[in-house]
Amino acid sequence: GMYEYQLEAEMTHEFLHHGERQHAYTPIIGSGGNACILHYISNDNIIKKNDLVLIDAGSEYDYYASDVTRTFPANGKFSGEHRAIYEIVLAAQLAGIKAVKPGTAWNQIDKIVTKIITQGLIDIGLLKGTLDDLIEKQACTPFYMHRSGHWIGLDTHDAGRYKINDKWRKLEPGMVRTVEPGIYISADTPGVPARWHNLG
């Protein structure tokens, strides 16, 4: 195949074709193990047939930023391991989106997403123990090392506090945030069978 930067060029063409004049941030196009590197921007490897491809990109339109992350199989067909990870992340994202409403505390969305990801990793055998103990120990951190989202608006990571007077901020009408959980299993993640390696 195609190089990651060639896929970036196709995406950039579509953005420009539809009126976007600039990216909201440097696009991330990661295939295979590169999909497991947060904020990977080299975009210079060949995409292999059995890789998962992660695109994290956004356009800027009328001064407002967007931020979209999607993962798909390069060959168009999920393997069993690909599908298992994809479905856990999708379930976490959908639950997080459902929780975004006025009155919900910022960290409540993180808790919902983390619970679903942790349970999913238990279900597929990558974590062992009880759900509550694993959440308390933050056992999913080697696989999911960031929060569920951030403010977005005139900037991709828009200004705004997550806490006020040391209390988690509650969402209000007009606030905009992302919900973008993920699972990243690099080849050097300890104790993980090889069939799960390089999934992100």
Q: What are the functions of these language-model segments?
A:
Residues 1-200:
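Active-site neighborhoods and metal-handling regions in enzymes and metal-associated proteins
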